[in-house]
UniProtKB/Swiss-Prot annotation:
Gene Ontology BP, a term: asparaginyl-tRNA aminoacylation
SUPFAM superfamilies referenced in this protein's UniProt entry, alphabetically: Class II aaRS and biotin synthetases (SSF55681), Nucleic acid-binding proteins (SSF50249)
UniProt KW keywords: Aminoacyl-tRNA synthetase, ATP-binding, Cytoplasm, Ligase, Nucleotide-binding, Protein biosynthesis
Enzyme class per UniProt: ligase
Catalytic activity: tRNA(Asn) + L-asparagine + ATP = L-asparaginyl-tRNA(Asn) + AMP + diphosphate + H(+)
A GO cellular-component term linked to this record: cytoplasm
Identification of the protein by name: Asparagine--tRNA ligase
Species, as recorded: Shewanella amazonensis (strain ATCC BAA-1098 / SB2B)
Similarity-based family: Belongs to the class-II aminoacyl-tRNA synthetase family.
């Protein structure tokens, strides 16, 4: 007798006639007049539940089997047989059903069989993985995570764990969560009346990181090709479907690379990940296509078969100004493109993923390489049909004098970035990288529109439960 995951059963790892045990939770119970119960049991290893055919001859049939409700946990043993029904290939002719956990009150169980709105499920985030939609999201999220690591490993990258606690603001935006052990009820003060951070844990101000990029650059300038994959934090007071206070970022960094190199890397990585989902998680993708967004499978298949278009920011602005469409946000050179502009370019003009390059320097970060025109930087965004921006990146400024001028221009302290400047003083090299918001990627793949529903426990303004 083997302990089997339901996914392995449906993959054909066990021949008909094999005695197996599956462990999981009851999704539904249906009783027939012939004295047989049909239990749909799932274990999360795949989308489908397996049907157990349970005869009334079992010793605990009346006392336990007939009392099973959605959410009860069971171990079901039996002989695997080909299913006569059209719903699935196999079912289990049960010879034993062991109840390992009851639902206290089926009438108040939040995950009972009836359908719930996805908004309601956020209020019961500790139980929502038991639903079809969140379970499917979790498996696709895992598939994408594994694909990212495989892609970079196969391409010679080294995974670097960058710090979560930092003293530097990568984006220069100041929207950071402070980390402190000071007594908030009795803050130490300097003679000038300001908070005395010399007495804090690190002896200075410290924050949760907004990006691993700057730290990642230090390793790229020694190991050539690295990537980071971890949590990042933004204290933006944005209550939208596109923003989280805590989210995950994928950030590769490549020495001796320019903007075109990382645009190609971004295209290869996205196509690799989407192919992995289409090959490994088609059961979940069919659910998303049926219940969430009918275009998700076609969209991914179209994406992986398309060549990325490329356009300069200046030309993109001209396209938008001359397209005859009225946008909510008027288009002029120097603005940061809004989602409506990005989606028009990807969905209506190019009808393909598009890389927009060479943005005005005044709307981009200090570390992006200044172009020869003195007005733009070697920055890029990858825009995807259906969502807009999915990746942002740049060639980094490797010239110390230009970097210093940019820091000064943006009123940032050179002293705060002394270690970052050292990279330009000791064997500087051209290098480039990008950032991919992982939840935005999961949202794009699944069609689930709000990124609070594609991370296990969302953190957002006024929301830090569980």
């Amino acid at each position: 007798m083997s302990i089997a995951s339901i996914a392995s059963v449906f993959k054909g790892d066990f021949a008909p006639g094999t005695e197996i045990t599956v462990r999981g939770w009851v999704r539904t119970r249906r009783d027939s007049k012939a004295g047989i119960s049909f239990l749909a049991v799932y274990d999360g290893s795949c989308f489908d539940a397996i049907q157990g055919v349970v005869p009334n001859a079992l010793s605990n049939y009346n006392d336990e089997v007939l009392k099973l409700t959605a959410g009860c946990s069971v171990e079901m043993t039996g002989n695997l047989v080909e299913s006569p029904g059209s719903g699935q290939a196999f079912e289990l002719q049960a010879t034993a059903v062991k109840v390992t956990g009851w639902v206290d009150d089926p009438d108040t169980y939040p995950m009972a069989a009836k359908r719930h709105s996805i908004e309601h499920l956020r209020d019961v985030a500790h139980l929502r993985p038991r639903t079809n939609i969140i379970g499917a999201v979790a498996r696709v999220r895992n598939c994408l995570s594994q694909a990212i690591h495989r892609f970079y490993h196969e391409n010679g990258f080294i995974w670097v764990s960058t710090p979560i606690i930092t003293a530097s603001d990568c984006e220069g935006a100041g929207e950071m969560f402070r980390v402190s052990t000071l007594d908030m009820e009795n803050l130490p003060r300097t003679d000038a009346g300001k908070v005395d951070y010399d007495q804090d844990f690190f002896g200075k101000e410290a924050f949760l990181t907004v990006s691993g990029q700057l730290n990642g650059e230090t390793y790229a300038c020694a190991l050539s090709k690295i990537y980071t994959f971890g949590p990042t934090f933004r204290a933006e007071n944005s209550n939208t479907s596109r923003h989280l206070a805590e989210f995950w970022m994928v950030e590769p960094e490549v020495a001796f690379a320019d903007l075109n190199d990382i645009a190609g890397l971004a295209e290869s990585m996205l196509k690799y990940c989407f192919n992995a989902v289409l090959q490994e998680r088609m059961d979940d993708m069919k659910f998303f296509a049926e219940r969430v967004d009918g275009s998700v499978i076609d969209r991914l298949q179209s994406f992986v078969s398309s060549d990325f278009a490329q356009v300069d920011y200046t030309d993109a602005v001209e396209i938008l100004q001359n397209c005859g469409k009225t946008f909510e946000y008027p288009v002029e050179w120097g603005i940061d493109l809004q989602s409506e502009h990005e989606r028009y370019l990807a969905e209506e003009h190019f009808k393909a993923p598009v890389v927009v390059k060479n943005y005005p320097k005044d709307i981009k970060a200090f570390y992006m390489r200044l172009n020869e025109d003195g007005k733009t930087v070697a920055a890029m965004d990858v825009l995807a049909p259906g969502i807009g921006e999915i990746i942002g990146g740049s060639q980094r400024e490797e010239r110390l004098d230009v970097l210093d001028a940019r820091l000064e221009e943006m009123n940032l302290s050179k002293e705060d970035y002394w270690w970052y400047r050292d990279l330009r003083r000791y064997g500087t090299v051209p290098h480039a990288g990008f950032g991919l918001g992982f939840e935005r990627l999961v949202s794009y793949v699944t069609g689930v529109g709000n990124i609070r529903d594609v991370i296990p426990f969302p953190r957002a303004p006024r929301s830090a439960n569980f």
